[in-house]
Amino acid sequence: MQILLASAKIMNAATSVDIPMKSKPKFQEQAGLFALELSTWDTNRLMKELKCSQAIALENLQRYQSFWNEEELLPSILAYYGQAYKYLQADNFSQDDFAFAQDHLFITSFLYGLLRPLDMIHPYRMEGKVRLDATKGMNLFAFWKNYLTNMLIEAVKANDGILIHLATEEFEHLFDWKRVCQEVKVIQPLFYVDKGDTIKMLSVHAKSCRGAMTKFIIQNRIDQPSDIFNFELNGFRYAPNYGDELHPHFIKK
C-alpha cells in the first residue's frame, strides 16, 4: 500500500531530527535546472508567477540563488510545515517510522516532481501553472505528467496495487490521473463536517485529517485499506453509510 500526500507552501529552514538515512530526489537534475532559471528572475516576476507577496518573492529568490548550498538541505517529510504536516508530526517519528514512510509514502512537489520522505531537498516556493524555458514553455502540470504517471503506477503495482490518495485534488494534474485510476486501485478518504441538513468539507479540517491519517498509517504499519476505518481525529470518524469503497467518508458530527 502506497500513500500520496501533497507538499506544502510553508517550509521549515532547519531541523534537528535524526533520520535513519538520506536519499536523493529522483528528479534532482530537473529541479536544479528550474532553480537556476528562477534564480535569474526579479522579485516582480516571482510575485506574479508565484502569486505571492513581495516579501515571499524576495525570500524565494534568495532560496533559489542559494539552491546548491548543501547545508540548507532537509528531508522532505521534515521540510514542509503546512497544515497537513502539523498533524503528520514527523518530528516525533521513530527511526522505524521513517523507514516505513520511506517505503510507503510519496510527496508531490511542483519543483521536485515526486519525493520520498527522506529525499534531501532545498526550501522553495513553486506553482503548477508556472512556465519555464527548461520545460520548453509547458506549465509544470503538463511537464511532470510525462515523468510521474508511469513512476507512480509502477511503484504502486510493485507493492500491492493500492494507493491511498491523501493529496489535494490540485496535485492530480501532475499525473494522467485517469490512467492512474485505471491501472491501480485508488482509495481517496474524504473528510466532512455534519451541518445537520448536509455534510460539508472544510479545507483546514481536511488538511489536518490527511496529515493525521498519513501518520496513523505509518505508525500502525497499516497494509490493509480496511484498517484505515479505525482512524479518528477530533470527532472525525468513519461513516459506513456514506461514500463507497473507493471514497470512504470520515464525518464529524
Model-derived features: where do they sit?
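C-terminal accessory regions
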Residues: M1-Q2, R179
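Active-site helix-to-loop segments that bind/position phosphate- or nucleotide-bearing substrates
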Residues: Q2-N92
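Internal, well-folded beta-alpha domain core
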Residues: A90-D244, H249-K253
